[in-house]
């Protein structure tokens, strides 16, 4: 099978980072912990959002991968599956930070995957909408966390929703919820 894997929120934990770092940075309490976008989590302006990522982007992208991601991905590879990293990272960096650019984000992601021992057959940098690439690479399962992407992708293939506060209410046909990387492995092995 062809397995697509998102980065932010799937390989790299995002929800708690935004809440913990945002609470300190903005000196505010969380307004809505079930939102994907930090602007809505803290009810902040686009300018405040950009300032946050200017300061925090490198700290965020340099953190280690989610526990067992590497281990499970290697097990999937050993079982003959092709692994595609499909990410919007590095396609619109200028929209939220001046600290790094798209090229840096792409180059650093490749380095980060290597540092975290994350196996892949190919890395696909795509715009926020991933459906065209999912169709092109005939992805059987896409592991995704962003609510909008989960819904769009579920129209064309199976989505393993990496569960988070912000996507708990996203349900539907072709959407299977997973709570950990070993949970993901069990879902794929079952099919």
Each model region followed by its residue ranges:
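Active-site neighborhood of HAD-like aspartate-dependent phosphohydrolases
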Residues: 1-51
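Short hydrophobic segments within beta-strands
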Residues: 6, 86-88, 143, 162
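Short, well-ordered beta-to-alpha junction loops that form the rim of enzyme active sites
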Residues: 14, 87-90, 146
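Flexible, glycine-rich phosphate/dinucleotide-binding loops
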Residues: 20, 92, 168
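Hydrophobic alpha-helix position signal
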Residues: 22-23, 76, 113, 134
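Short glycine/proline- and acidic residue-enriched helix-loop micro-motifs
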Residues: 51-58
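Substrate-recognition element of Asp-dependent hydrolases with the DxDx(T/V) motif
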Residues: 60, 69-108, 126
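C-terminal cap/substrate-recognition subdomain and adjoining C-terminal extension
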Residues: 81, 98-191
């Amino acid at each position: 099978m062809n397995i697509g894997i998102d980065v932010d929120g799937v390989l790299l934990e995002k929800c708690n980072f935004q809440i913990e770092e945002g609470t300190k940075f903005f000196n505010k309490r969380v307004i809505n912990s079930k939102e994907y976008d930090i602007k809505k989590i803290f009810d902040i302006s686009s300018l405040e959002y950009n300032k946050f990522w200017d300061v925090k982007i490198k700290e965020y992208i340099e953190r280690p991968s989610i526990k067992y991601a590497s281990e499970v991905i290697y097990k999937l590879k050993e079982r003959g599956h092709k692994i595609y990293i499909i990410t919007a990272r590095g396609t619109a960096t200028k929209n939220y930070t001046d600290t790094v650019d798209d090229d840096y984000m792409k180059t650093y992601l490749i380095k980060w995957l290597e540092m975290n021992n994350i196996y892949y057959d190919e890395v696909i940098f795509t715009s926020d909408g991933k459906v065209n690439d999912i169709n092109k690479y005939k992805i059987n399962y896409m592991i995704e966390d962003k609510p909008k992407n989960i819904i769009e992708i579920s129209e064309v293939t199976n989505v393993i929703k990496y569960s988070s506060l912000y996507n708990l209410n996203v349900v539907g046909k072709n959407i299977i919820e997973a709570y950990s990387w070993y949970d993901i492995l069990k879902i794929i092995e079952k099919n």
